[in-house]
């Protein structure tokens, strides 16, 4: 269950300690630090009961207060009782306690540092109910749906957000920006989504992180594959692939062919590029913004001068590649800035980061060279684009409005929290009156059944 829910990818300690916390999650509102979830009584969840654990995982309410939805509890609300129990037992009794907390703490700007605002947000966007174990267990009729929408929480990254940063269910899995990267459309649409992928290709991608002629995982997807998907068995991987192949298609009106097929025609071999006299510091020369020279110096040794990559595709082709042929340049820029690191049972893949070797102008220049020669030539990148992508991409509308309205917007946000929280209380009273639901102060223990009160 910990693998399926991808707990390790976010809760990994900065020193690589499993579940020790400290990993920084870049959210639209700022940096959120994942906590220690080992059985340490002082720093982790060692003092939590199973009911408290279930409440935190499903409702985002821990013994210490409200969690932020960087912890995907709106998706985990669907976890079955049996899987909650299995996850609790594993984390409580099978993990070595880490006796220290993260070195930094979450510190979001006002008013988002007021966690009580989550009462209103949760009333709108965290209303899921546990699924039945009989349907979601291996071989169950809803196994694929469960792995995609609940344990895998794919929508947390791949579904666009609305103005209040809740998932826009009308565009489920249609693609969204996450921390500078772009989590692509994974609906069944053959042009904008994964409809052109076979089930077997999807399984290979989940297992290895790479499908030649399609895509190579980087960023958060590489983490999800390394720590989670690559450890699932074939039955579960096929269940995920089958479900995604049946997700209603959503077409992006601006795309006319799949991202991996944008530049299928190979141009003539490039002319030799005169690099002049090169020194170890030459890449940091901010005056050199010639894309061809930068590509030859920084990229061609691995991806080859013609962009074809190596024969075994250990260093991938820049043609038929979603990073270069996608609807926007975010993943190309982020791969250059952050590099790539991915380790699975099939091997290790890496690309160095050029964040400190190239200026924003140079990253833009080499990105444009790659796009024009090997990828989606309709795109272009400026230095300001690179700077914005490095900073996490375009700010959500809510933050942009707050920047303009300042105090009024802050007051509105606080008012929203109060109104939505009041609405939640009214709905809770109605549920209690109907005598079929528990109060927020009580969550059934494993095996306990709710009865009318």
State where each predicted segment sits:
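Sequence context of c-type cytochrome heme-c attachment sites
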Residues: 1, 12, 17-44, 55-56, ...
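Sequence/structural segment immediately N-terminal to covalent heme-attachment motifs in c-type
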Residues: 1-13, 18-25, 118-122, 132-162, ...
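C-type cytochrome heme c attachment motif
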Residues: 3-12, 35-36, 51-58, 73, ...
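Short, solvent-exposed loop/turn and secondary-structure capping segments
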Residues: 12, 18-23, 65-68, 98-105, ...
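Active-site substrate-binding loop specific to GH73 endo-beta-N-acetylglucosaminidase modules
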Residues: 20-26, 160-209
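Axial heme c-ligation environment in periplasmic c-type cytochrome domains
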Residues: 31-47, 58-82, 103-107, 183-194, ...
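Post-cleavage N-terminal segment of exported redox proteins
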Residues: 32, 56, 60-64, 82-138, ...
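Short, aromatic-rich amphipathic segments at membrane interfaces
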Residues: 384-409
């Amino acid at each position: 269950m910990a693998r399926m829910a991808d707990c390790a990818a976010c809760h990994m300690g900065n020193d690589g300690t499993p579940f020790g916390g400290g990993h920084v999650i870049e959210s639209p509102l700022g940096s959120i630090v994942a906590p220690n979830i080992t059985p340490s009584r002082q720093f982790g969840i060692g003092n939590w009961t199973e009911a408290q654990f279930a409440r935190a995982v499903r409702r985002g309410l821990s013994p210490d207060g409200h969690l932020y939805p960087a912890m995907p509890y709106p998706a985990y609300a669907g976890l079955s009782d049996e899987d909650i129990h299995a996850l609790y037992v594993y984390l409580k009794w099978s993990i070595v306690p880490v006796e220290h907390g993260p070195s930094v703490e979450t510190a979001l700007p006002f008013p988002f540092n007021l966690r009580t605002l989550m009462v209103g947000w949760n009333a709108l966007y965290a209303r899921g109910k546990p699924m039945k174990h009989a349907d979601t267990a291996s071989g169950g009729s809803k196994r694929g749906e469960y792995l995609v929408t609940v344990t895998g929480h794919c929508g947390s990254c791949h579904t666009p957000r609305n103005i209040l940063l809740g998932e826009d269910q009308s565009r489920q899995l249609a693609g969204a920006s996450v921390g500078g990267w772009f989590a692509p459309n994974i609906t069944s649409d053959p042009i904008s989504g994964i409809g052109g992928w076979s089930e077997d290709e999807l399984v290979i991608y989940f297992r290895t992180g790479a499908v030649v002629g399609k895509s190579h995982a980087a960023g958060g997807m590489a983490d999800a594959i390394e720590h989670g998907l690559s450890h699932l068995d074939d039955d579960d991987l096929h269940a995920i692939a089958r479900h995604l192949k049946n997700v209603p298609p959503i077409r992006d009106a601006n795309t006319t062919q799949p991202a991996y097929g944008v530049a299928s025609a190979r141009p003539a071999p490039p002319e030799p590029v005169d690099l002049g006299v090169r020194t170890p510091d030459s890449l940091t020369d901010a005056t050199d913004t010639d894309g061809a020279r930068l590509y030859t110096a920084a990229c061609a040794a691995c991806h080859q001068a013609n962009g074809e990559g190596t024969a075994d595709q250990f260093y991938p082709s820049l043609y038929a590649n979603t990073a270069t042929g996608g609807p926007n340049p975010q993943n190309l820029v982020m791969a250059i800035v952050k590099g790539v690191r991915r380790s699975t049972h099939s091997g290790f893949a890496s690309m160095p980061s050029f964040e400190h070797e190239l200026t924003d102008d140079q990253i833009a220049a080499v990105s444009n060279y790659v796009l024009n020669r090997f990828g989606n030539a309709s795109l272009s990148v400026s230095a300001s684009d690179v700077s914005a992508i490095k900073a996490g991409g375009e700010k959500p509308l809510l933050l942009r409005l707050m920047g303009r309205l300042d105090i009024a917007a802050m007051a509105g946000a606080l008012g929203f929290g109060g109104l939505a929280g009041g609405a939640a209380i009214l709905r809770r009273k109605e549920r209690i009156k109907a005598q079929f639901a528990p109060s927020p102060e009580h969550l059934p223990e494993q095996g306990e059944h709710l009865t009318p009160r």
